[in-house]
Amino acid sequence: MRALLFLRKDPLGAAFIIYLFAVGLTGLPCEQVGRLFTDDPRIAPIAGMAVCRAVSAVVMLFFCIQLGLFDAPRPAVRSLRAALPALLVALNNAPVIALISGTAAVTAQASAVTLFAFECVAVAAFEEVAFRAILFPLMLQRFGTGARARFSAVLLSSALFGLTHLLNLFSGAAVGATALQVGYSFLIGCMLAVVYLHTGSLAGCILLHAVYNFGGMLVPTLGQGAFLDIWNLPTVLITAVLAVFAIVFYLRLLLREDALRAGSLCRLTAEQRFALRRIHV
């Protein structure tokens, strides 16, 4: 029996507890951890973030398993075409035009880029397990699997995902940049929640998330390039068109989704229902 299964008697309460754990793990002293491995001021934060988020991902995976969500009935990994708009959004986050034109460049060695790629995967794994594999199904369990309920579950889980990025203020991030990050993190969270709902592929969501982070943060972290050079007019126009297309595509997909498929993400098995009936809380 899963040790934390009893928490699913109150899905919103369970979601709140998991969210508090996620916030706490987000606040781990990544830079200090990184200094245990290297004195390089450029590499230490990357190494620390990679280690802390990898450990956090394992912790969240443990919670996911113990809540009976990791082995919940999954929809077949199909209709991968539904992930194509998300993949385009993720790839477009890289400053391709600026890199080709030479107005932006990656100046770090290949080893640093490889470490940064691992960091992006670790961050994505932690956040996808926490917000898509745990919080989102718990909210589906609470609200239901109808169109309006699915919409509410996507919005609430993604809003919590976006608000978590407010913690960056404590590490010295600018208010404007943090507000922008909260906004686009909410939108990315909505997109990934719908992808997860439709495909049932947690690994796919992790990959999309990692590609998005890698493309968007590689130059600012390990390269050089002015903001206006990276976000030049062609890039802004392409991004705007892709954003509108993705919003319309995933909103239609969400509202037209099969309720049975949504239910498979949060439905308790017969064994789990029997176990819950024996638990008195």
Residues of each region from the PLM?
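Functionally important transmembrane alpha-helices
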Residues: 177-235
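Hydrophobic alpha-helical transmembrane segments
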Residues: 13-17, 83, 87, 151-156, ...
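Membrane-interface helix/loop boundary segments of multi-pass membrane proteins
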Residues: 129-156, 194-201
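Active-site-flanking alpha-helical
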Residues: 130-139, 172, 208, 215-216
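Aromatic-anchored segments of alpha-helical transmembrane domains
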Residues: 21-29, 90-99, 158-167, 210-221
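Short, Lys/Arg-rich, polar N-terminal cytosolic tail immediately upstream
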Residues: 1-8
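C-terminal membrane module of polytopic membrane proteins
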Residues: 47-53, 210-281
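Alpha-helical transmembrane segments in multi-pass membrane proteins
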Residues: 11-65, 78-100, 110, 114-119, ...
